[in-house]
Regions:
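Hydrophobic anchor at the beta1->P-loop junction of P-loop NTPases
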Residues: 8
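The conserved Walker
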Residues: 12
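Conserved glycine(s) of the Walker
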Residues: 15
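Conserved substrate/cofactor phosphate-moiety recognition/catalytic segment
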Residues: 18-69
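Glycine-rich phosphate-binding loop used to anchor ATP phosphates in small-molecule kinases
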Residues: 56-113
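Short, amphipathic alpha-helical "lid/cap" segments that border enzyme active or binding sites
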Residues: 61, 65, 172-183
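Conserved phosphate-donor/acceptor-positioning beta-strand/loop module used by diverse small-molecule
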Residues: 103-125, 165
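Small-molecule kinase domains that catalyze NTP-dependent phosphoryl transfer to phosphate-bearing small molecules
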Residues: 123, 127-178, 189-190
Length: 190
């Protein structure tokens, strides 16, 4: 059986990429696809309100699935995607793309949901590293507060897989160990 696809879904600034990097530092063979690797090339060409934006985002995901998830030469690598999908029509549709890609490739699909205290989330999202970074990461505390008050994070319902982890007071390496342990348990059951 192929190695799992771990899909980390959380609000911006929760620690997705930091935790994915911690997973890679512990795991033997891990490939990380940060959502900004899929967002930023599209954002260079289209504004988020352009009708072509979501079409191009889907194409970027499909290319990533083909290259990293479905290519037989990557079957032994655990693939970790970071994402932010809310519980609306678009968010559900995008989330199911990840699950479908894993199924097509014969990989266990492991959704991970991260949460953290609002004030900690804002502190992380407005860190110097993010504010002066080279990606389109959200750094606006007002917008983040608005997202968190109006949006619900998408979670697969009825799926026996998946865990939710509060990252507020946990070290990223400890969270990575929880995720890897859980993914190994799922892998053994499959």
């Amino acid at each position: 059986m192929a190695a799992p696809l771990i899909w980390i879904n959380a609000f911006p600034g929760t620690g997705k990429l930091t935790i994915a990097k911690a997973i890679k530092s512990i795991g033997a063979s891990v490939t990380i696809i940060d959502n900004h690797q899929l967002i930023d090339p599209v954002a260079l060409r289209f504004s988020r309100d352009d009708p072509c934006y979501q079409i191009e985002r889907k194409r970027e995901r499909e290319r990533a699935f083909k290259r990293h998830v479905q290519d037989p030469s990557t079957a032994s690598e655990t693939i970790v995607f970071t994402d932010f999908q809310t519980d609306n029509e678009l968010g559900r549709s995008v989330a199911y793309e990840y699950q479908t890609a894993a199924i097509k490739a014969g990989r266990p699909f492991i959704p991970i949901y991260l949460e953290c205290d609002l004030e900690v989330n804002i502190e992380r999202a407005t860190s110097q590293e993010r504010v002066f970074g080279t990606t389109t990461k959200l750094t606006d505390p007002i917008l983040l507060r608005d997202f968190r008050s109006k949006c619900r994070l998408f979670e697969f319902e009825g799926l026996s897989l998946g865990i939710c982890i509060d990252t507020t007071n946990k070290d990223p390496s400890d969270i990575a160990k929880i995720i890897l342990r859980y993914s190994q348990e799922v892998y053994k059951r499959e």
